[in-house]
């Protein structure tokens, strides 16, 4: 079976300091599905006692360090008492380390297909967040736009509630998300700048203003080339902001315009 695994952008990103005895950061954001950037995934049940996962680009097999797909398959078997193993072939088009949620999208697409195939409808988002990742519930939800809170486990559907004309600028930089968060954690002083209730109200009125990404300055410190490109991209009529921990940018223009992907070679 073949399925598509879509990217997403994070419009605004408020990150909270870790609470005592917590290993994850709470956060707030607006996630938007990007349906013209996607990976193709082929899923086949196999008669083996081990999963067989491979990644490809347009021409060759590639090595991907993340074991999130393996962890997801193990979580499915443990949680739902499914014994099957699978061959997973993933053709990557979503850039790795781009702040577009590619790994989480892959995990969610595979989980969604297997659970539907097995007739399972119940998914505990909090368990998914705790065991696998904060972005996965959004990709499972079927929402095209959502306000995300409570470590990624609570989603408010915003699909169709505002029209946003934007460009996604893809840089050829693989950002290490873990290091960006470590840089964020090193700073003991942090002020939350986003008011998402106000942001959502403004977006419904076609107003894009005062939207911030708390990780942006830390990404720029670690990757000066990304900051340099950000300064280049700032221009009249566009609101430019980093997606996630980077390296992609969202450029928002309020005039009617089809979504556009700009690639940096």
Curated annotation (Swiss-Prot):
This is 4-diphosphocytidyl-2-C-methyl-D-erythritol kinase. It is an enzyme of class 2 (transferase). GO terms for biological process: isopentenyl diphosphate biosynthetic process, methylerythritol 4-phosphate pathway; terpenoid biosynthetic process. SUPFAM superfamilies: GHMP Kinase, C-terminal domain, Ribosomal protein S5 domain 2-like. It comes from the Bacteria. It catalyses: 4-CDP-2-C-methyl-D-erythritol + ATP = 4-CDP-2-C-methyl-D-erythritol 2-phosphate + ADP + H(+). PANTHER family: 4-DIPHOSPHOCYTIDYL-2-C-METHYL-D-ERYTHRITOL KINASE, CHLOROPLASTIC (PTHR43527:SF2). Belongs to the GHMP kinase family. IspE subfamily. It comes from Ureaplasma parvum serovar 3 (strain ATCC 700970). Catalyzes the phosphorylation of the position 2 hydroxy group of 4-diphosphocytidyl-2C-methyl-D-erythritol. Coiled coil: none annotated. The active site is at residues 8, 135. It holds the Pfam family GHMP_kinases_N. Pathway: Isoprenoid biosynthesis; isopentenyl diphosphate biosynthesis via DXP pathway; isopentenyl diphosphate from 1-deoxy-D-xylulose 5-phosphate: step 3/6.
